[in-house]
Regions:
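C-terminal helical subdomain
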Residues: 91, 108-144
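Residue(s) in the substrate-gating loop at a strand-loop-helix junction
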Residues: 49
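Active-site-adjacent segment of SDR/Rossmann-fold oxidoreductases
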Residues: 35, 54, 75-87
Length: 168
């Protein structure tokens, strides 16, 4: 993910991110879901982010793609439940996880990140248990809750300030 002003990112990088985070998730969810529904068995685990619940100044494309994954997963999960299907879709929405993401985006996180193995275990456990949304830490659950309460103009400012600190 690129960290900086939207106007400064390259269209090529934006489209690569959209292809990876949106198109690939959409295609794979659609293809696997048809088979799973016909067998009335299966689990889909889509990797989103806590960013999927917020706007993301300075990482606009990344946040937008994660919003897509979160929204798609939640909506399809609801549809499956309404159909009476045993198939589930889980949106895994962690905060910072120790991966190479930081180096790729050229950022450092101000908040502690969780180990990738810990995140993976939590995601798989929640998916197997049929959870619609999986948020692995209490702190990130508070972030999601807080994002619902804060007016959009303030949330945009907060998110922008957090991203600015990553690149400064």
């Amino acid at each position: 993910g690129y960290c900086g002003e939207f106007v400064s990112s390259t269209l090529e990088n934006d489209l690569e991110m959209i292809d990876t985070n949106v198109r690939a998730v959409h295609i794979l969810t659609k293809l696997f879901l048809k088979d799973f529904v016909s067998k009335n068995s299966g689990r889909i685990l889509n990797v989103a982010s806590i960013a999927g619940f917020m706007p993301g100044p300075m990482m606009a494309t990344y946040y937008a793609t994660k919003n897509y994954v979160t929204s798609l997963s939640r909506a399809v999960s609801y549809e499956l439940k309404e159909m009476g299907s045993a198939v589930t879709v889980t949106a895994f929405c962690p905060g910072p996880v120790n991966t190479e993401f930081n180096q790729v985006a050229g950022v450092s996180f101000a908040t502690a990140s969780i180990e990738s193995k810990t995140a993976a275990r939590m995601a798989i456990t929640d998916a197997l248990n049929g959870k619609r949304v999986s948020i692995p830490t209490f702190k990130m659950k508070l972030v999601r809750f807080g994002a619902r309460l804060v007016p959009d103009c303030l949330l945009l400012k907060i998110c922008s300030n957090i991203q600015q600190k990553k690149i400064n």
